[in-house]
């Protein structure tokens, strides 16, 4: 099997993990009804997953740093499958929380390991595209996994979704066992030493790009549906189609980000993508009550926002190459924190200012990310910058 197909297998695994994380938002009403809890209590399942994912991933990656990446993938995927099995067979809210915690612990390690393996087995000069493919699998869960999961839940009950994910996860474990090569781990790095990485200016600045880019995106995206309905005046019957197109644009943007990184380098792709991100957020607040105009801007926004994902992953992997796995795991945690903080800040502005303000607040966050990017690139020696471009 070619390495290209192996990378696609990793993308499929990433898709399963993403679906398991995001599916809750698509079946929240069914979970609340079946378990006899409020929607707010059901919503905590999302918060718990994100926090466990963010906090446990760096710790687990540090403890398993020297382990063969294929073996680590098998163990982490096994833990993830076990969590989904528990969600499928055990009754009650408390047991479901426990299952979500186990899922999240496995999920974080699976995604980071998939990104690491993809970068290591990719052909020279194609690492950015390889990472983009894995990221695209995770992104696809929003567009395909959540709607498909909703359909399965309506037909067979919401627990069947987790049973299906567990079954597909088991199949993925078998395929990975027979196809992925032995891949060396990184040099073990104690957790305190990982945290000490924040003392390095380029690492702290690099991770701040993730926080402000995705945080700015989250401010607006979290409240996109009510924004389109109440501010842009889009008909509710058309909303699902608009969101589907938005999701497809994110897939295209993610793939383009990897291609652009390989062809034109990190600085051009990162700064260019985030600049377009800001422009589209501002335009979205100016172009209202025009269905075609709003749709075009949404497509460009989604494309620009997600072109940054694989580029930033590759950028972090090149900042400290010998600790790429550690940095990628820290980045996964930062992404989870950014989404949570962005949603929280967006809620504050929606409640105390206006729904229309979220695009401007989101644009401000992305602007800070651009400034951090420019500071990093301008401080690098020309040769180091050339290395990043390759």
Curated annotation (Swiss-Prot):
Transmembrane segments: 7-27, 35-55, 77-97, 101-121, 128-148, 161-181, 203-223, 238-258, 281-301, 335-355, 357-377
Protein name: Uncharacterized MFS-type transporter YbcL
SUPFAM superfamilies referenced in this protein's UniProt entry, alphabetically: MFS general substrate transporter (SSF103473)
Highest taxon above the source species: Bacteria
Originating organism: Bacillus subtilis (strain 168)
GO biological process: transmembrane transport
Lipid bilayer topology: Multi-pass membrane protein
Alphabetical list of PROSITE patterns matching this protein: MFS
Keyword Transmembrane helix among UniProt keywords: yes
Coiled coil residues, start to end: none
Cited InterPro entries: MFS (IPR011701), MFS_dom (IPR020846), MFS_Efflux_Transporters (IPR050189), MFS_trans_sf (IPR036259)
GO cellular component: plasma membrane
Family the UniProt entry places it in: Belongs to the major facilitator superfamily.
Keywords (A to Z) from UniProt: Cell membrane, Membrane, Transmembrane, Transmembrane helix, Transport
CDD domains on file: MFS_NepI_like
UniProt GO molecular function: transmembrane transporter activity
Main localization (coarse): membrane
Gene3D superfamilies per UniProt: MFS general substrate transporter like domains (1.20.1250.20)
Subcellular location: Cell membrane
């Amino acid at each position: 099997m070619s390495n290209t197909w192996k990378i696609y297998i990793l993308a499929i695994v990433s898709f399963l993990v993403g679906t398991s994380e995001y599916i809750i938002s698509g079946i929240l009403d069914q979970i609340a009804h079946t378990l006899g809890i409020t929607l707010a209590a059901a919503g905590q399942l999302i918060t718990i997953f994100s926090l466990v994912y963010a906090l446990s991933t760096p710790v687990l990656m540090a403890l398993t740093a020297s382990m063969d990446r294929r073996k680590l993938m098998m163990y982490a995927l096994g833990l993830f499958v076990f969590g989904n099995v528990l969600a499928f067979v055990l009754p009650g809210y408390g047991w479901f929380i426990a299952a979500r915690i186990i899922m999240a612990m496995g999920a974080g390690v699976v995604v980071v390991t998939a990104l690491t393996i993809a970068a290591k087995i990719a052909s020279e000069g194609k690492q950015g595209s390889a990472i983009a493919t894995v990221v695209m699998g995770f992104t696809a869960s929003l567009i395909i996994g959540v709607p498909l999961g909703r359909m399965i839940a309506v037909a067979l009950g919401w627990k069947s979704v987790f049973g299906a994910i567990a079954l597909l996860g088991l199949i993925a474990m078998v395929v990975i066992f027979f196809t992925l090569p032995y891949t060396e781990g990184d040099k073990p790095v104690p957790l305190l030493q990982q945290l000490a990485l924040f003392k390095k200016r380029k690492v702290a600045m690099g991770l701040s790009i993730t926080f402000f880019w995705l945080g700015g995106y989250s401010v607006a995206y979290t409240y996109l549906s009510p924004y389109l309905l109440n501010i842009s005046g889009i008909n509710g019957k058309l909303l699902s189609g608009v969101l589907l197109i938005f999701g497809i644009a994110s897939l295209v943007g993610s793939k383009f980000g990897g291609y652009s990184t390989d062809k034109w380098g990190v600085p051009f792709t990162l700064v260019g993508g985030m600049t377009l991100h800001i422009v589209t957020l501002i335009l979205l607040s100016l172009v209202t009550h025009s269905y075609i105009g709003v749709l075009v801007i949404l497509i460009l926004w989604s494309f620009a926002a997600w072109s940054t994902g694989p580029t930033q992953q590759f950028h972090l992997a090149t900042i400290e190459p010998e600790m790429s796995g550690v940095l990628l795991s820290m980045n996964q945690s930062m992404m989870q924190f950014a989404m949570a903080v962005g949603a929280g800040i967006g809620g504050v502005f929606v409640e105390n200012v206006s729904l229309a303000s979220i695009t401007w607040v989101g644009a401000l966050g992305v602007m800070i990310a651009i400034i951090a990017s420019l500071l990093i690139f301008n401080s690098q020696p020309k040769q180091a910058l050339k290395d990043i471009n390759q």
